Design a protein with these regions (language model features):
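Structural motif marking the loop-to-transmembrane transition
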Residues: 1-2, 80, 131, 395, ...
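Sec-dependent N-terminal signal peptides of Gram-positive bacterial secreted proteins and lipoproteins
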Residues: 2-22
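A generic local structural motif
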Residues: 10, 44-46, 262
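A mature extracytoplasmic/lumenal domain signature
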Residues: 10, 82-84, 111-113, 125-127, ...
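Membrane-proximal envelope biogenesis segments
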Residues: 13, 25-40, 62-63, 68-71, ...
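Active-site-adjacent loops and short helices of periplasmic peptidoglycan-processing enzymes
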Residues: 21-209
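Domain-terminus/edge residues, biased toward the C-terminal soluble/receptor-binding domains
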Residues: 174-178, 186-191, 195-410
């Protein structure tokens, strides 16, 4: 539906001058340098001095807006190791949301899944576990066998699931990614980039925040149920970063001899969530320290803006062919926006009503939007909804209205 800016003097007095809002692209900074040596990667224009980064590739992203705050070789295709499982988990949570599976569904481990090497939970063929426990095994213990078991449960085979992984990557705009398996075991053509890892991590966090329930588990356990009986198996979180950085809450680590140390690290402070992707670090100490360095830089750049008066109490949106000429909007208590390298004093907002809004309008129907901009760049919006229904003006109502006016005039 087209939109038109409301030219109402009272709104101008409340909100100030209206400005044109543009949906500009997020800050996207390219970098140069030798990936094998310590180089100065480029940060936000006008930001702090460039960071000293040893890892082959890094990227720092603000969750809410998707703004890239810092990057180095962010589009270089590298081996992601177990960070691959971010996509596996994304597809699992999307299947849960659609109702294709439920957390208490039973997953049967196949011979193929049980044969996975690397990090594993040592399932036996024929063993049964719930979807919820499989998610724990993937997110907490980074179990390759659990990831493949879930892939087969969802798609019938790992190959079919991998096809879905690649299709979803394409849909998300992950232009430097090709998956060959569901767990991240070494395959020459199994590659992705720091930018693409940030994209899928953001998708998982934004739309399936329940992942944090699992990613923040430090210790847990499952029960193996095999032909030999039952036995407890302890799960220890592979992401030790959780205890190293204040506010850390995820998301996935990875290591193979060729991929080196990788991580999609997430942390939240004062309402701001950041994603720091590190790929190709020579040691886990370098991986962790550079994730910390990126997050420290990001939190120094970000702040939270709270608008406590989104719209005036008497705001009315024009309506055509209705029993009244306008409709009030439902009150909006407040709206919070994460600002990246910006001053709250530079924020402007404008009320935009839907063009040619015609009755009938149900209660709660969208009738407009408040858009926020900073230095001319779109940074967010709040939808406006009708506070009560507006019936269509019909012949019977018109006669009644005319009769009422005549009576009142006497």
């Amino acid at each position: 539906m087209k939109k038109i800016i409301l030219a109402i003097m009272t709104l101008v007095l409340v909100f100030g001058s209206f400005v044109t809002v543009r949906a500009d692209a997020p800050v996207d900074v390219a970098t140069d340098g030798d990936a094998e040596a310590v180089v100065e990667a480029t940060a936000l224009e006008g930001g702090n001095e460039a960071l000293q980064i040893q890892s082959k590739s890094v990227l720092l992203m603000e969750l809410e807006s998707g703004t890239v705050l810092y990057e180095k070789n962010a589009d270089e295709m590298l081996r992601p190791a177990s960070v691959t499982k971010v996509m596996t988990l994304l597809l699992i949570f999307e299947a849960l949301e659609r109702g294709d599976i439920a957390l208490d569904d039973t997953v049967v481990v196949t011979e193929h899944a049980a044969s996975m090497g690397g990090s594993q939970c040592f399932f036996e063929a024929g063993e049964e576990q719930t979807v919820q426990d499989m998610i724990k095994c993937i997110e907490v213990a980074s179990g390759n066998d659990a990831a493949v078991a879930m892939a087969e449960h969802l798609a019938g085979s790992e190959a079919a699931f991998v096809q879905k992984m690649n299709e979803r990557a394409k849909e998300l705009g992950m232009e430097h990614t090709h998956f060959d398996n569901a767990c991240g075991l070494e395959v020459e053509t199994h590659l992705t980039s720091a930018r693409d890892i940030a994209i899928m991590s953001r998708q998982l966090l934004l739309y399936h925040p329940d992942i944090l329930t699992y990613s923040t588990i430090w210790m847990d356990s499952i029960t193996h149920k095999t032909r030999r009986g039952e036995s407890r198996f302890d799960l220890a979180n592979t992401n030790k970063f959780l205890n190293l950085y204040t506010g850390a809450n995820g998301l996935k680590t990875g290591y193979t001899s060729q991929a080196k140390y990788c991580m999609s690290a997430t942390a939240t402070r004062d309402g701001v969530t950041l994603i720091a992707v590190v790929m190709g670090a020579e040691t886990k100490e370098v991986r962790n320290s550079e994730a910390m360095k990126l997050l420290d830089y990001g939190f120094a750049q970000c702040r939270t803006y709270v608008d406590t008066e989104v719209v005036p109490e008497d705001l009315q949106i024009p309506v055509k062919k209705g029993t009244c000429k306008s409709v009030p909007v439902k009150p909006v208590e407040q709206h919070t926006i994460t600002l990246v390298a910006a001053n709250p004093d530079q924020i402007e907002k404008q009320v935009i009503a839907y063009e040619n809004l015609k009755a009938p309008i149900p209660e709660g129907d969208a009738v407009g939007v408040v858009q926020y901009s900073c230095n001319g760049t779109y940074i967010g919006e709040v939808m406006l909804y009708a506070e009560y229904p507006v019936p269509e003006l019909n012949f019977r109502y018109s006669l009644s209205d005319i009769a009422g006016r005549i009576f009142m005039a006497k």
